[in-house]
Swiss-Prot record:
A zinc finger (C2H2-type) spans 68-90. This is Zinc finger protein 1. One of its GO terms (molecular function) is DNA-binding transcription factor activity. The gene is ZFP1. It comes from Arabidopsis thaliana. The keyword Zinc applies. It comes from the Eukaryota. Induction: Induced by white light in dark-grown seedlings. It is found in: Nucleus. Highly expressed in the shoot apex, including the apical meristem, developing leaves and developing vascular system.
Length: 228
């Protein structure tokens, strides 16, 4: 009987000790002075809950990805960087289109002669068109074309010089304005006019020489002897 009584007493002591330890742990936990093992257990529950929430958030993102749409063509992109590059390309295209329209309007407002020669060429040839082709007797013209002397032509060369001057004046009146001519054509026609002037001058010199020679021959034929 005694050993059994002693065993029962020891069991009661163990139970009491266990109850006391449990009460002590609860009091320490309520005061915030729990042991490290208890704290680690609590933290493990917290980390597991946070990991599950993060995993759920990732699954939601994969299930419903964010989409960015273009403001110009309504094209959809899955990143803001790709959308920004696409919209910058749209802006460059619109800038080039506006610049092309501006140049087109500017060119259409210019006169037709400006397309062939440019602004400087038009003003230069327009000023040249206002200059006289023939200067006065005493002064040279601005274009460098000298006027011929106004000496009297011989009678037998009158028709030739008159016809040449008529042809020369007709060619001048038939030419278009210098402002609408090409520079190469203008120089060629000025050279042709100079050649015709040189021919007329040569004919004048030949006629003057022939008239002097005929006068000299007639002077020789005169009989200067006195007849009584």
């Amino acid at each position: 009987m005694e050993p059994s009584i002693k065993g029962d007493q020891e069991m009661l002591k163990i139970k009491k000790q266990g109850h006391q330890d449990l009460e002590l742990g609860l009091t320490l936990l309520s005061r915030g002075t729990a042991t490290s093992s208890e704290l680690n257990l609590i933290d493990s529950f917290k980390t597991s809950s946070s990991s599950t929430s993060h995993h759920q958030h990732q699954q939601e993102q994969l299930a419903d990805p964010r989409v960015f749409s273009c403001n110009y063509c309504q094209r959809k992109f899955y990143s803001s960087q790709a959308l920004g590059g696409h919209q910058n390309a749209h802006k460059r295209e619109r800038t080039l289109a506006k610049r092309g329209q501006y140049y087109k309007m500017t060119l259409s407002s210019l006169p037709s002669s400006a397309f062939a020669f440019g602004h400087g060429s038009v003003s230069r040839f327009a000023s040249m068109a206002s200059l006289p082709l023939h200067g006065s007797v005493n002064n040279r013209s601005t274009l460098g074309i000298q006027a011929h002397s106004t000496i009297h032509k011989p009678s037998f060369l009158g028709r030739q010089t008159t016809s040449l001057s008529h042809v020369f004046k007709q060619s001048i009146h038939q030419k278009p304005t210098i402002g609408k001519m090409l520079p190469e054509k203008f120089h060629l026609e000025v050279a042709g006019n100079n050649n015709s002037n040189m021919v007329a001058a040569k004919l004048e010199r030949i006629g003057h020489f022939k008239s002097n020679q005929e006068d000299h021959n007639q002077f020789k034929k005169i009989d200067l002897t006195l007849k009584l």
